[in-house]
């Protein structure tokens, strides 16, 4: 009773064709296939990435020193001092 019988699948297919139209279905199937291919390739890359660090550990570079609150980074990448805020008295 809970399983889908061939008649149920036929009704579902007819409803899908009526809702989406015969012109949009090939485009939707093509997009779904492309998405699945991308997903499979990403899963393979993740598996390859997991296997690579176990065999050859890569040295991590030392983190760069971040500018402090009293300095700002200018266009050439050098840190320049920033003026300190002054107190303004109301009139």
From Swiss-Prot:
Alphabetically ordered keywords of this record: Cell membrane, Membrane, Protein transport, Translocation, Transmembrane, Transmembrane helix, Transport
GO CC aspect terms: TAT protein transport complex
GO molecular function per UniProt: protein transmembrane transporter activity
Entries under InterPro entries matching the protein: TatA/B/E (IPR003369), TatA/E (IPR006312)
Entry's transmembrane regions: 1-21
Compartment(s) of residence: Cell membrane
A Pfam cross-reference name: TatA_B_E
Chief location bin: membrane
GO biological process: protein transport by the Tat complex
Membrane topology, from the record: Single-pass membrane protein
Quaternary assembly: The Tat system comprises two distinct complexes: a TatABC complex, containing multiple copies of TatA, TatB and TatC subunits, and a separate TatA complex, containing only TatA subunits. Substrates initially bind to the TatABC complex, which probably triggers association of the separate TatA complex to form the active translocon.
Homology family: Belongs to the TatA/E family.
Function: Part of the twin-arginine translocation (Tat) system that transports large folded proteins containing a characteristic twin-arginine motif in their signal peptide across membranes. TatA could form the protein-conducting channel of the Tat system.
Database matches in PANTHER family: SEC-INDEPENDENT PROTEIN TRANSLOCASE PROTEIN TATA
Listed name of the protein: Sec-independent protein translocase protein TatA
Gene: tatA
């Amino acid at each position: 009773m809970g399983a889908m019988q061939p008649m149920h699948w036929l009704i579902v297919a007819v409803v899908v064709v009526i809702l989406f139209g015969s012109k949009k279905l090939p485009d939707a199937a093509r997009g779904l296939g492309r998405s699945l291919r991308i997903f499979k390739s990403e899963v393979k890359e993740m598996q390859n990435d997991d296997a690579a660090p176990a065999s050859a550990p890569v040295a991590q570079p030392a983190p760069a020193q971040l500018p402090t609150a009293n300095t700002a980074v200018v266009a050439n990448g050098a840190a320049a001092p920033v003026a300190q805020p002054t107190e303004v008295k109301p009139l």
